[in-house]
Amino acid sequence: TDLYFEEGSGKYGKGYATASYDVSMEDPWFWCHFIGDPVMPGSQGLDAFLQLAGLWAGASCELFGRARALEGNYTYNGQILPFSKKIFYRVDIIRFLKKKKVLFFEGHLAVDTPENIIYQFGSNKMGFFTKAELSIPDKPSGEYYQPDWELAKIKALEWIENARKYYEHK
């Protein structure tokens, strides 16, 4: 996996970030999404794109806080399958408003070669907020968020079993 940031360049002269990910048949999403038709969820690619934009903001020292996607558009024109080799991400910064703590950006995701673009991410907007602005307690999350992991595991296994039964009867 590679990660690269640069300020003051890119499509709009404001900066860009690139990243890549080596796909493995052992990646966790392939065994459950979808049974008998494995594919990486499109939302996984979208989330990685948004994470890369947030990383650019932090690495550039321009915007800080908890990032939240505010708006955006995207188009999927392909899939990432278990035999895909590598995913390439690119984020181009359109502009950032430091006082308003907002980032505008676009980009794409390609599979196997940087030229094989399968997801287009049009104009996106991301805001950066403090814990107080989001009404998040100012203490470690373990003090206010304590999920019942055993129940979560039971529910996940039930879902997998029900999915297997469903596909066996198709």
Residue ranges and their predicted role:
Residues 2, 24-26, 38-66:
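Active-site helix/loop of acyl-thioester processing domains in fatty-acid/polyketide metabolism
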Residues 14-17, 100-108:
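Short aromatic-glycine-enriched beta-strand elements
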Residues 50-94, 120-121, 125-127, 170:
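Hydrophobic beta-strand-centered segment that forms part of the acyl-chain substrate-binding groove
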Residues 116-170:
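Segments adjacent to and within acyl-thioester-processing domains across lipid
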Residues 10, 27, 99, 117-119:
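Residue-level signal for secondary-structure boundary sites
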Residues 8, 96-103:
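Single-stranded nucleic-acid-binding OB-fold domains
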Residues 1-40, 165-166, 170:
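Catalytic strand-loop segment that frames the active site of acyl-thioester-processing enzymes
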